Curated annotation (Swiss-Prot):
Alphabetized UniProt keyword annotations: Acetylation, Disulfide bond, Early protein
Name of this protein: Protein OPG064
Organism: Variola virus (isolate Human/India/Ind3/1967)
Protein family: Belongs to the orthopoxvirus OPG064 family.
A Pfam family per the record: Pox_E2-like
Description of post-translational modifications: N-acetylated on initiator methionine by host.
InterPro entries: Poxvirus_E2 (IPR007585), Poxvirus_E2/O1 (IPR021155)
């Protein structure tokens, strides 16, 4: 349980109405300790500024922009890849950043700064060269474009749009563009020429051709706004738009129809009532299912005929359509119809829209995995919800007032997330708890210290272990002395590094000293330094021609290096997958969407990061919003690596999948020096891996996309292995003291 004793004391002693207010009364040391673990309000008092700068500078965004010193800001954001949370601070200190920052820092900050014409002139003077200014300007934001008079070149426009397609909108509003350029952008990028530069090129056929390319209602409306009215009254244009409306593109043409098609209501058919009040008696029409689907989005225009529409829906068993207009048909909904809507409709309906909140309806909602089950609390007690297997604690619940209505819901939340700084921060500092609800929350947490509320199931889960004060302890590396009396051959390898402080060089030195490696064994290594360049010469490990054996031995090396504090970041396979972040934020996670490479590649020293630098390295590599701990980053590395070697290894393996999986796990444990044996079957994992193998072998792609939850059993296995790794590591080092 997160310790809230000091916060509770401050809350009671100072008669605070919010937990945020109580946090401001904490002693600085106590406050900083909580801030370090990510447990803090959405803003901080100025009194904590110096301590935050010294101990957790990445949290400077919690102060008002004017409180943050420019140099402190620049020093902090220079080290971070993801600076989204500093957006207002970056714009506030724009001038200091432009004057002080180098090109890479300015590029990083451009999306957040409101750039003026004077700023562009300054950037041109600072960074001479067309390519430099074009590259920097490609990161400009739309707010800047709306405020400047600077005219972008066609090359600059293309560069900006290549980076962010939707920047065409402010650019096209900003300046008149050549018609040939506009046509090219339409053909190449599908960008509608909503610009006065195209007006002279428009005629009915061209207007229709452009409308055929439109994919956003807003673009259709804005394009028709610039067209000459005489051309909009042409019959060919009217006929095309009427047919487009009948195809379902209703919201593309609402302003146009009201201005130009009042005399064509008969041609609009059932859709006429959307634009003109009760223009058509729809009871005289033969209404198709497609038409019902289209008008259901605009059912408020058909209230006169709602009974007629409902009769057609029920006669034809169109449950999906009934669900889409549920708020307009409350009187006809029985318990049976509510259950059918829940079970048969493609999209979930809001529980608040179900007029009957019976236990049976609730059970159906639970089975269909509804996220707003909490709304049944208006009729059903929380114990019944839990007994039936409901989880009323979801993202949706934060959008309601239920936490202030039910103290039992807060208690349930604490049982689920009381160990998790991120999730408790959301409820305590970001949700508008009443004073009474805040008091109950603090009292419950303070009176249930330790892990008493999390026994027996939660304490052995990976999310719990990631949020608790664990760490991975490494074995000391037995450094060996350099041997200089070596005669080299031409086949020897040479690696050069630009600095002695180079992290890849440091990793290489440590790797060379770790005993027992199978594939990353560099023989007879020597170093030569010259002009700040250091060259490493060594005899490479002999190639292993058996692919399956090479993969297994390579995984052994990765695990063995991890046991000595050198962790492999598999970002060339998984470019954006960080399951640990989801877990510490209390969110569900699924398998990666894509594996970038289907071949297990050779290892390089720069891919291994020392444990003490791992949190920063992983956070920057994946551009996370905040820096995770070294311990959390290590688990992310181990879990990602194990997943990759299971998936890609099984694709390359010629062994029976079950034997391969068990062998991989055994090797992984052996490399980490963990005495564990898997006690559960892996048949479900094998089925998943075999399906991936079949799919990969039937194509010739160098990468593979994964469906959601396609590797759920495999991920569960990886989680369990990580849990065993954490528990074994901490227990082993405790017992060895």
């Amino acid at each position: 349980m997160i310790s809230v004793t000091d916060i509770r004391r401050a809350f009671l002693d100072n008669e605070c109405h919010t937990i945020t207010k109580a946090f401001g009364y904490l002693h600085e040391d106590k406050a900083i300790a909580l801030i370090k673990i990510g447990f803090h309000p959405t803003y901080l008092p100025k009194v904590l500024y110096n301590n935050v700068v010294e101990f957790v500078p990445e949290k400077l965004y919690l102060f008002k922009p004017r409180t943050v010193a420019p140099l402190d800001l620049i020093s902090t954001i220079t080290k971070l890849k993801n600076v989204d949370k500093f957006a207002s601070h970056i714009n506030y200190h724009k001038n200091s950043i432009l004057i002080t920052g180098d090109k890479s820092l300015i590029v990083k900050c451009m999306p957040y700064m409101i750039i003026s014409d004077d700023d562009i002139r300054f950037i041109r003077e600072q960074f001479v060269g067309t390519n430099s200014i074009e590259y920097i300007l490609s990161f400009i934001n739309k707010e800047s474009i709306y405020r400047m008079s600077y005219q972008f070149s066609e090359n600059e426009i293309v560069t900006i749009i290549n980076r962010d397609h939707f920047m065409y909108e402010p650019i096209y509003e900003h300046q008149v563009l050549d018609s040939d350029f506009l046509k090219t952008m339409l053909d190449k990028y599908g960008i509608v020429p909503i610009n006065s530069g195209i007006i002279d090129e428009l005629y009915p056929e061209a207007i229709i051709e452009i409308l055929m390319a439109v994919v956003r209602p807003r673009d259709a409306i804005r394009f028709l706004d610039i067209v000459n009215k005489n051309q909009l009254t042409e019959d060919s244009v009217k006929n095309y738009i009427i047919n487009d409306i009948r195809r379902g593109k209703i919201d593309y043409y609402i302003p146009y129809v009201e201005d130009f098609l009042e005399d064509r209501t008969e041609d609009l058919g059932i859709y006429a009532n959307i634009f003109f009040e009760d223009a058509i008696d729809i009871t005289k029409l033969d209404i198709t299912k497609t038409e019902l689907e289209h008008i259901s989005k605009y059912i408020n225009y058909y209230t006169t005929y709602i009974d007629h529409i409902v009769n057609i829906i029920l006669q034809n068993n169109y449950i999906d359509i009934l669900a889409s207009i549920i708020d307009y048909v409350q009187d006809v909904l029985t318990e049976e119809l509510c259950i059918r809507i829940v079970c048969e409709s493609t999209n979930p309906v809001p529980v608040t829209s179900l007029p009957i909140h019976s236990t049976l309806v609730m059970v159906m909602c639970i089975q269909m995995k509804y996220v707003d089950i909490v709304e049944f609390l208006d009729e059903i007690d929380i114990d019944t919800l839990i007994e039936k297997g409901a989880d009323p604690i979801t993202e949706y619940t934060f959008t309601t007032r239920w936490y202030n209505k039910h103290n039992d819901l807060i208690t349930l939340y604490i049982k689920k997330y009381g160990f998790c700084p991120m999730m408790m921060k959301r409820l305590m500092f970001e949700y508008p708890l009443t004073k009474e609800a805040s008091d109950h929350l603090l009292k419950t947490m303070d009176e249930n210290r330790g892990a008493i509320m999390f026994f027996p199931r939660t304490i052995c889960t990976l999310p719990y272990l990631l949020c608790c004060n664990y760490k991975l302890i490494q074995k000391p590396i037995p450094f060996k002395e350099e041997n200089r009396n070596i005669v080299y051959k031409k086949t020897n390898r040479v690696l050069c590094f630009d600095l002695l402080e180079n992290s890849a060089f440091k990793s290489l030195i440590k790797i060379d000293s770790i005993p027992g490696l199978k594939t990353y064994n560099m023989k007879d290594i020597t170093y030569e330094k010259s002009n700040n360049i250091i060259c490493v010469r060594f005899i490479p490990q002999e190639s292993i021609h058996n692919e399956e054996r090479r993969i297994k031995l390579q995984l052994f090396d990765i695990a063995r290096l991890a046991s000595y504090g050198l962790y492999y970041i598999p970002s060339r396979y998984l470019s954006s997958w960080t399951p640990v972040v989801n877990m510490i934020e209390g969110r569900e996670y699924t398998n990666p969407q894509k594996i970038e490479c289907l071949v297990i590649l050779d290892l390089f020293s720069e891919e291994f990061i020392e444990y003490q630098n791992l949190g920063n390295a992983v956070s920057n590599k994946y551009e996370l919003e905040y820096t995770i701990s070294n311990y959390q980053a290590a688990i992310n590395c181990l879990m990602s690596t194990l997943l990759i070697y299971l998936v890609l290894g099984s694709i390359r393996s010629i062994s029976k999948t079950e034997n391969f999986v068990l062998s991989i796990l055994n090797i992984f444990y052996k490399g980490l020096k963990i005495n564990e044996l898997l006690s559960e079957p892996v048949s479900g994992v094998c089925i998943e891996l075999d399906k991936i193998k079949d799919r990969a072998s039937s194509g010739d792609s160098s990468f593979i996309f994964l469906k959601k939850n396609e590797l759920s059993k495999t991920l569960s296995l990886c989680e369990k292995v990580c849990v065993e790794t954490i528990l074994d590591n901490n227990q082993s080092f405790k017992s060895s003291k």
